[in-house]
Amino acid sequence: MVMKFLIVGVGAIGSAYLAFLTRAGHEAAGLVRRNPVNRIKVEGIWGEFEIPVKTFTKVEEVPFIPDIVIISVKSYDTEEALKKVKPVVGENTFIMIAQNGYGNYEKAVEIYGEGKVILSRIIFGSKVIKPGHIRITVSADEVVIGDPSGKIDEEFLKNLARTFTEAGIPTRYERDVYKYLVDKIIYNSALNPLGALFEVNYGSLAENPHTKELMNRVIDEIFQVIEKAKLPCFWKSADEYKKVFYEKLIPPTAEHYPSMLEDVKKGKTEIEALNGAIVELGKKYGVSTPTNEFITKMVKAKELFNLKDT
């Protein structure tokens, strides 16, 4: 079945959705702030192709009411993007959050209500070579989609997952999608900021006793927050998670550098949706998070230094 998709934010992840859905014959368009692209070249582990695409800078230019609006902007632009697309969000349009980090789904529900927002856990890596040219570098698992509120029809979500898979982005439906998101928040919060601060890959962080101790502290604090905030989670304890983290999760991605490393060089990261969000949740629920707070401030300091250099 041909569907209509509007992808908001045509960066690394958004470009992948726009290119693969267009190639599969769906009516897909991108919404960008500036510099529209008319072709996307894809290379990497999911194959190589180049395809003409439609992108617009104004929401009024979008020539259809989409079935799905995919939000793939950086976390700090989420609220603005959600409000910007309102004119094309029809009665039967769903918002899909294709971002990692805490707070994006919550913002979407605040604006559009439960039963209107699909949450996804993105775990493939895409790198922008230049605008209109991306490389799919890694895929640790399928994309997971679902509705934490349980209000969206399961068959619709299963069919949507099948649509993405048939388009070339392996996806499955999971009722427990929020647990997958929390899992990714723990992983990203432990690895990304330290990788960005020290400019090293994940394997190096695990091998260095000092960064390993910092990661352990980050994880311990996150689990204290998870318990107090009653966030859904696969793991019963920080120790249970750490065992899997060091033995199973890091080895396959040991050579990987965090995307936050590129972001911090440009002076803007998603730290507020990761460790920064843990700090805020800690304050809300009375949990002390000194390591997460220190790392958040370190990343924000590096952002500021790099902004002054640009």
Curated annotation (Swiss-Prot):
Q: Is NADP one of the keywords UniProt gives this record?
A: yes
Q: Where in the cell is it found?
A: Cytoplasm
Q: What class of enzyme is it?
A: oxidoreductase
Q: Name one Pfam family in it.
A: ApbA_C
A single Gene Ontology CC term: cytoplasm
Q: Where does substrate bind?
A: 100, 188, 192, 259
Q: What is its main location?
A: cytoplasm
Tree of life domain? Bacteria
Q: Which InterPro entries match?
A: 6-PGluconate_DH-like_C_sf, 6PGD_dom2, ApbA, Ketopantoate_reductase, KPA_reductase, KPR_N, NAD(P)-bd_dom_sf
Question: What GO biological process terms does the UniProt entry carry, in alphabetical order?
Answer: pantothenate biosynthetic process
Give the metabolic or biological pathway. Answer: Cofactor biosynthesis; (R)-pantothenate biosynthesis; (R)-pantoate from 3-methyl-2-oxobutanoate: step 2/2
Give the Enzyme Commission number: 1.1.1.169
Keyword Oxidoreductase on this protein?
A: yes
Q: Which GO terms describe its molecular function?
A: 2-dehydropantoate 2-reductase activity; NADP binding
- Kindly identify the residues recorded as the active site: 184 (proton donor)
Keyword terms: Cytoplasm, NADP, Oxidoreductase, Pantothenate biosynthesis
Q: For NADP(+), which residues are the binding ones?
A: 9-14, 100, 270
**What is catalyzed by this enzyme?**
(R)-pantoate + NADP(+) = 2-dehydropantoate + NADPH + H(+)
Which purpose does this protein serve, as stated in its record?
Catalyzes the NADPH-dependent reduction of ketopantoate into pantoic acid.
Cited NCBIfam families = apbA_panE
What the entry lists under PANTHER family is as follows: 2-DEHYDROPANTOATE 2-REDUCTASE, 2-DEHYDROPANTOATE 2-REDUCTASE-RELATED
Q: Which family does it belong to?
A: Belongs to the ketopantoate reductase family.
Q: What is the official name of this protein in its record?
A: 2-dehydropantoate 2-reductase
Q: Which organism is it from?
A: Aquifex aeolicus (strain VF5)
